[in-house]
Amino acid sequence: MAQTPDGISCELRGEITRFLWPKEVELLLKTWLPGEGAVQNHVLALLRWRAYLLHTTCLPLRVDCTFSYLEVQAMALQETPPQVTFELESLRELVLEFPGVAALEQLAQHVAAAIKKVFPRSTLGKLFRRPTPASMLARLERSSPSESTDPCSPCGGFLETYEALCDYNGFPFREEIQWDVDTIYHRQGCRHFSLGDFSHLGSRDLALSVAALSYNLWFRCLSCVDMKLSLEVSEQILHMMSQSSHLEELVLETCSLRGDFVRRLAQALAGHSSSGLRELSLAGNLLDDRGMTALSRHLERCPGALRRLSLAQTGLTPRGMRALGRALATNAAFDSTLTHLDLSGNPGALGASEDSGGLYSFLSRPNVLSFLNLAGTDTALDTVRGCSVGGWMTGRADWRAGRGGLGPPAGVANSLPPQLFAAVSRGCCTSLTHLDASRNVFSRTKSRAAPAALQLFLSRARTLRHLGLAGCKLPPDALRALLDGLALNTHLRDLHLDLSACELRSAGAQVIQDLVCDAGAVSSLDLADNGFGSDMVTLVLAIGRSRSLRHVALGRNFNVRCKETLDDVLHRIVQLMQDDDCPLQSLSVAESRLKLGASVLLRALATNPNLTALDISGNAMGDAGAKLLAKALRVNSRLRSVVWDRNHTSALGLLDVAQALEQNHSLKAMPLPLNDVAQAQRSRPELTARAVHQIQACLLRNNRADPASSDHTTRLQPLGLVSDPSEQEVNELCQSVQEHVELLGCGAGPQGEAAVRQAEDAIQNANFSLSILPILYEAGSSPSHHWQLGQKLEGLLRQVGEVCRQDIQDFTQATLDTARSLCPQMLQGSSWREQLEGVLAGSRGLPELLPEQLLQDAFTRLRDMRLSITGTLAESIVAQALAGLSAARDQLVESLAQQATVTMPPALPAPDGGEPSLLEPGELEGLFFPEEKEEEKEKDDSPPQKWPELSHGLHLVPFIHSAAEEAEPEPELAAPGEDAEPQAGPSARGSPSPAAPGPPAGPLPRMDLPLAGQPLRHPTRARPRPRRQHHHRPPPGGPQVPPALPQEGNGLSARVDEGVEEFFSKRLIQQDRLWAPEEDPATEGGATPVPRTLRKKLGTLFAFKKPRSTRGPRTDLETSPGAAPRTRKTTFGDLLRPPTRPSRGEELGGAEGDTSSPDPAGRSRPRYTRDSKAYSMILLPAEEEATLGARPDKRRPLERGETELAPSFEQRVQVMLQRIGVSRGSGGAEGKRKQSKDGEIKKAGSDGDIMDSSTEAPPISIKSRTHSVSADPSCRPGPGSQGPESATWKTLGQQLNAELRSRGWGQQDGPGPPSPGQSPSPCRTSPSPDSLGLPEDPCLGPRNEDGQLRPRPLSAGRRAVSVHEDQLQAPAERPLRLQRSPVLKRRPKLEAPPSPSLGSGLGTEPLPPQPTEPSSPERSPPSPATDQRGGGPNP
């Protein structure tokens, strides 16, 4: 048994490795418990974050004890005998003895290094206690890597800490966190840890990630916004705040925190003296007074003051606000530190009950506040109860001198009430840049005193950039004082003044007209929603006179009733936009409901010289406004931003704007109109998506920077001069060299010691090289502020402008000389000279037409060049570090090879049983580190990549399956008799994995491939497969109807819808009788019937409902109304319907039906579905046309083609009708028309026909209907009636038949299956079959005395055929009628002869039989024994 220097055999080492797999063993030490001696063998296996004490006397191995390094509270080392004592959380004391001091020191170094990775600021003195010898402790300190030489892991070792905590708590390691940290935070240099990035994880995983921040030195901010924190996460946040000294910012907004959390947070901060917290935001959490009192107490005593404090919308009361104000006023550190204070959204916190000792006491002191937000706190903005500013300030000074700032004296709170502007004018007027006092009261008393505090503050302000007074209901005097103070201040520039919703009205408009021109400090003015109305005319004129206003918001002020006044206002705004001297650049008329009035502004954009931003959202201008906007964008080149949401714009309007942006290259920003897009998406989603994508593509094109510059910018990110895989390679190589050094040991001889020293130097140089990369990046990315370079570039731009002007002048002069020489008489007038001077005047601003970013682009190019230089230098440094590490590792490998000749056998048997082979240095390295060897081979084989995109350190799959597991086939796939596809790929080859111990899989036999040219076929391809059958449970109470087997003649032997016919053939309610003619014996014995189509829509949806035809016929309408069968006569609209082409199954039946009477009434009317009704032309009166209306023409793809009437045919029919003189009836028809007006539309048939009972004659103009068929009983002739115009109708029928034959339509001359209908009236007798000319066909079955078909019991062989089966037929075998309608009719309807007249004046006699020639088999009608679904037996 081969023994290693540490006394552990190779077999035992392999057994331990397999026992602890997949965990990686880093160090094995032989040990024993005190008193047992060396006879009792134990091995201490040290992993990365955990130690295992294994009992190795007998196999299998047994774990006697295991503990995490984070459980170690203290360690005590002893040299004689060499032993260590652990103080653990789970065990009070664990003593282990080792064979030598070297093993003891290795254990101490490994545990100390692991603990230091988790706790970077820990020291060896805290970990090792007495009786640890000082000499041993000194050796351990010298051997432990320092922070400068220790390779830096991503984000300050966050992942290592997180992994250690997962091992300590027994939780799985989440790779999502590892990926985010490696890919996002580290590569982008982000020090802001957001819990929202991991909100999809469980609360325990989230709590572990927060706990890993407790001792992290990289992250500076922890934020959680709009996310409810669980109790575990809250506890870890409190623990982190009590331990972390590097976290500077804590943002917990809208996290459902309560006052108890704030109290505990204050306690945690109070107990941590070295806390680095400087920014705190608890906005959106309901904090009670106790929580605010505890936080205020901490803020009052903390040595390090906060820079930012946000307590917006926290439910602060006046008591909590007073406590906070006193804390800020008491701690003098806040005067020079606090710059951002947000207390907005706390109504009543600064109300009338607030005294002078609260927040105003801090604001009145000199401080450095730059951001103050007190919106919605009910604070008084100016003087209350007439108190003067000077007296209030004097009293406050006396009070502060007498009480030292701890509280106001008696009576001060009543005599000196608080004022906001009075306080800030004394305290922070020189440093305040943002003041938001919106939604507050200006004054609580009606005082006529001038608001001196407001005017005083505005005259003293120096750096103010934003003043928000929205919703404060400013009186005219306050507005006048406001503008006067701004007029007196000569220090302010670019101030944004928000006066929206202040109810200024006419008085405020007059003040603004008088003083806005003098307020030169205001560059942006928001006057929205102030009810100006008609005063907008003069107000716009006053705004146009201002020379400082660049942005004006006038929305929600156009509530003008007079249209002329509104037009006047809009035209004044247009003049303001087109004025060359007006500096206005941005205009907002949002939420004004201008509708078509916005078109005036949009037309003005075509000639706009200055406007760069426009907001026209909320004006309901529709698609017309969108089209005008599109036209303006085609010619406008000054606009940079357009906002146009909430305008009722459809997809067409969006598409117009998108197409206009194709020609606009200057628009940079157009926020997506979400409301309009959401509405348009519902109606036309495809067109909307196309328009949105086109808009975004055009904006991206307009904002695209130089591709070379963008490539450099993305490549050279912070901490990214060298790609992360290169840094990872350096770190891995450092680790590999360190492992070689540890493997070499101390007794390696002079050459080994030299190799170790070289390796240590290489590691130190590599770590130092990586540490200077951020310095190189800062040096390369620092902006160039060389004033000489800037002056030269600006001078160069001026020179370019002068050259352009000179070029234009030369071109103009040459053009004039040429024009004068060619046409001197045309240039004698003076008008052309004025026009030419106007054009040349535009060349004065030619330097402004040069690229606006030319100067910035020049500095950007310089920065990119500097980054390229530093990047090249960084790459060379890293390359040198890699070369040094590789050389050191090669030297160590040579030393290991020389040492192996002494400690290991010189030769090993060959794997194939041949002669033993000597080990080369590379083979020895592959023996110890097979994974690294394979990785190097893969790197050598793969092409080199200078800038890899993905880090090699990202292991998204933590577990590696062994080769045996990969090669083992699944039982289902390997079982014989199954359709198993051959497996290919690396998983099927069974290559052994080095990381997976176990016996290697044997080589698989080679597969015999077919010769070239022969296709690869699976061996089970020809195997017969069983027929798939789906057994459906029959419905309760339904008859068991066996499904009909498919016909072989139809070519449907393999159907894909087995079981569908069984489903459709079963009924929930028993049917006793059903109208069905008998089957034709000729059809049964002749051609093979085509399978029937699927019953759809009304035919199958209401299959459980008994049809009306099953009920007995009734002769009296009064006694039994509505159920008697009604005979439906063929109308003129049925004549004009195009007949269908017969199928194969119909030809034989049609040939047999040629022997019957050729009466037109006997022709079977084609049965159309609702969609196919688009081909029918119905003649209805004008009133019926208005009542019914026309449905849109919706057709299916299979219905287009030969069955469609051409427009020319319809025109010919109309000409025929005009020739024969069809007109409206009169006389007795009027009475019948009035009587039957209530029953104009009786009911809809199963195929969508609307039964019309009107007797009114149709107009001469023919209009196609999609779903209406006239069935007027008054139009139906009697048994023997013949009108005088029968010859005319006969001629029309012959012409129609000839027209149909010329178009190639199938002629149906034989008798169709007559459909039994209901009698139209109880007093009218139904015509007999003899009088109607109906043939006595045996296939139709017997008839009753009324000429109706008698009902027949339900056939047992009925079944439903799916649509898929019908589509499998060949096109030649599928009849045209199947293409038109798959709807199954409930019963055939009896066809009546067409009415000879359409009104009462045309007679009531039926047409005589029309003799026709027998048709050919191609034109034969369908057999009566076959229904319209393809020739199957009729039900």
Swiss-Prot record:
Residues 573-667 are annotated as: Tropomodulin-like. SMART domains: LRR_RI (SM00368). Keywords: Cell membrane, Cell projection, Cytoplasm, Cytoskeleton, Disease variant, Leucine-rich repeat, Membrane, Methylation, Phosphoprotein, Repeat. Residues 1087-1114 are annotated as: Necessary for localization at the cell membrane. Residues 994-1003, 1035-1045, 1406-1424 have a biased composition (Pro residues). Residues 1018-1034 have a biased composition (Basic residues). SUPFAM superfamilies: RNI-like. Residues 1191-1203, 1230-1246 have a biased composition (Basic and acidic residues). Residues 1283-1297 have a biased composition (Polar residues). Changing residue 525 to Q: In IMD58; decreased protein expression in patient's leukocytes; no effect on homodimerization. Changing residue 1023 to A: Loss of ability to bind heterodimeric capping protein (CP), unable to inhibit the actin-capping activity of CP and to rescue the loss of lamellipodial ruffling, macropinocytosis, cell polarity, and invadopodia-mediated matrix degradation. LRR repeats lie at residues 64-88, 89-111, 249-272, 274-297, 303-326, 335-362, 393-423, 429-452, 461-481, 492-514, 519-543, 546-572, 581-604, 608-631, 636-660, 664-687. The modification Omega-N-methylarginine is found at residue 1303. Expressed in all tissues tested, including thymus, spleen, colon, leukocytes, peripheral blood, skin, skin keratinocytes and skin fibroblasts. Strong expression is detected in naive and memory CD4+ and CD8+ T cells, naive and memory B cells, regulatory T cells and NK cells, whereas it is poorly expressed in monocytes. Residues 972-993 have a biased composition (Low complexity). One of its GO terms (biological process) is establishment or maintenance of monopolar cell polarity. The keyword Phosphoprotein applies. Pfam families: Carm_PH, CARMIL_C, LRR_6. The modification Phosphoserine is found at residues 991, 993, 1120, 1246, 1315, 1420. The keyword Repeat applies. Belongs to the CARMIL family. Forms homodimers. Interacts (via C-terminus) with heterodimeric capping protein (CP); the interaction inhibits CP activity and hence promotes actin polymerization at the barbed end of actin filaments. It is linked to Immunodeficiency 58: An autosomal recessive primary immunodeficiency characterized by a variety of infectious diseases, including mycobacterial diseases, mucocutaneous candidiasis, silent but detectable EBV viremia, and staphylococcal diseases. Patients suffer from dermatitis, esophagitis, recurrent skin abscesses and chest infections. Immunologic analysis shows defective T-cell function and deficient CD3/CD28 stimulation responses in both CD4+ and CD8+ T cells. B-cell function may also be impaired. Cell membrane-cytoskeleton-associated protein that plays a role in the regulation of actin polymerization at the barbed end of actin filaments. Prevents F-actin heterodimeric capping protein (CP) activity at the leading edges of migrating cells, and hence generates uncapped barbed ends and enhances actin polymerization. Plays a role in cell protrusion formations; involved in cell polarity, lamellipodial assembly, membrane ruffling and macropinosome formations. Involved as well in cell migration and invadopodia formation during wound healing. The N-terminal leucine-rich repeat (LRR) domain is necessary for localization to vimentin filaments. The C-terminus is necessary for localization to the cell membrane. This is Capping protein, Arp2/3 and myosin-I linker protein 2. The gene is CARMIL2.
